[in-house]
């Protein structure tokens, strides 16, 4: 009886691993276990079912005809086979498909090999949907309700950011746009200038009105101009560059990839990707966040966004790129790695975006950025559009713009480098040994109804403080640079969802992260850089919502007291009397002015082309040491350096100097002391 028993299409008296008998027309092809119910229609009565007919049976995105679109873009592809034939889950290359291979369609989603998308046979899904570029037109794919819920959430979804009660006040923020022939701003998401498909996705994201930075950046980019934009943190900078570049992609279609010599695996599949848009950002969390936003607005389009960053499996990132890459979001280090491996070419880049450019330079990425922009195959500055976005643009970053941008528009929305008036700032005098008890008082007072973000300076303190809070029955988790990428992503997800409403973080999470519904930011340890303080508290009060920021201050933080007072006054916040007192008694300390002294000078957010020193020539490093008293960058006196203005808070100024807190990297012994490591 067992000899005649068949389960589905698998016969017990026929070994699938034994030598095959002579071909028989009565035997059906092997069907994987998870497909048997669908293919057999639940036929378990012993009758062998007919094999499925050859030809495209399962719809787009299916590399071997399984359900639900199959393993998208060739997930089971066998890289060792010359034709990229599929293989089984155990790596057995003898597993043959149960349908005839479909011919490569050169018209599927934008010509073979375009943008690193490799015609894997039948219009595989691109981007967050399966739109196509065909006959010079953008054809959006069908709606996908499950993916829509994942990307855009349900109405009133607490994990998705909505505009707050003060969002309309953004219209009162002053805007400075400098440059010649600046395009007029737009006041709504309309066509023109935006593409209709992008407008549909913007509506799905529940965006009603463009923010000030978007009102100006959309027409500027759509008119082909380079842009350097500064705006309040949380004011929509990501949309400011994604909206125009995606809209133009939908209107203009893909660019053909250059012919490759022996670089194809077959059937149009290429080894090297040719993205048309490149977005560089400093941290893993920020590039992941930008990628998530790009997926939203590329939904149902032909554009396929990809993300690459260090600290994650490079193999999975390579497979993602091989399935198609039109818009690439990357950290500089990992991008250089992939360029060296020959897996990404920048020759097709139309749009280069540098997000949080000042932080990338602070983190030491300038050599990699210059290599990417100037040392590889990226088009010349005159043959691409370059956009720089950040919440602060000090003078040295504006000098970098001289090399990367052409005839750019400088856009300053609000007083950049300042804080939002939507944030209520409180400064408490707390000695180090009292911080834990004061923190518990604050948490008991405010409760855990909203999300609370606590910033500390060291990784050890992040772990120690989160353990302490857990022992005090507060649901807390920590995120810092020593945690693995998976641990960091899990901690952020638990925080975003509200399952763990207290997050203790180092500076790794301070800038750029858009975490909805953070109602309270606590600076347990104040940073030494006032710009870091601005970006930390900018995690609350986003998109017009209100928030609270509390800072623990003591005499160990007197290096930032002057900048902190200016910041509080600027945002119309209460200035505690102890801050004024410490500022008066500590006049010898001065303000450090940020990392290496490049922080909040009086002109740190102005277009340097309009200042007296102009943009002419690199800074003068001769004449004295880096910290010559009075000179901006050691140019030898008051206004003689090429930046044309002394630092705001002297004490050595610039990159160092003789004052006690004169600068981060100068000669602590002063200009007459022994030479420093510079």
From Swiss-Prot:
CDD domains: DEADc_DDX3_DDX4 (cd17967), SF2_C_DEAD (cd18787). Its EC number is 3.6.4.13. InterPro entries: DEAD/DEAH_box_helicase_dom, Ded1/Dbp1_DEADc, Helicase_ATP-bd, Helicase_C-like, P-loop_NTPase, RNA-helicase_DEAD-box_CS, RNA_helicase_DEAD_Q_motif. It catalyses: ATP + H2O = ADP + phosphate + H(+). Keywords: ATP-binding, Cytoplasm, Helicase, Hydrolase, Initiation factor, Nucleotide-binding, Protein biosynthesis, RNA-binding. Residues 422-583 form the Helicase C-terminal domain. A motif (Q motif) lies at residues 187-215. It is found in: Cytoplasm. GO terms for biological process: cytoplasmic translational initiation; negative regulation of cytoplasmic translational initiation in response to stress; positive regulation of formation of translation preinitiation complex; regulatory ncRNA-mediated gene silencing; spliceosomal complex disassembly. PROSITE patterns: DEAD_ATP_HELICASE, HELICASE_ATP_BIND_1, HELICASE_CTER, Q_MOTIF. One of its GO terms (molecular function) is RNA helicase activity. It is an enzyme of class 3 (hydrolase). Pfam families: DEAD (PF00270), Helicase_C (PF00271). ATP-binding RNA helicase involved in translation initiation. Remodels RNA in response to ADP and ATP concentrations by facilitating disruption, but also formation of RNA duplexes. Belongs to the DEAD box helicase family. DDX3/DED1 subfamily. This is ATP-dependent RNA helicase ded1. It comes from Aspergillus niger (strain ATCC MYA-4892 / CBS 513.88 / FGSC A1513).
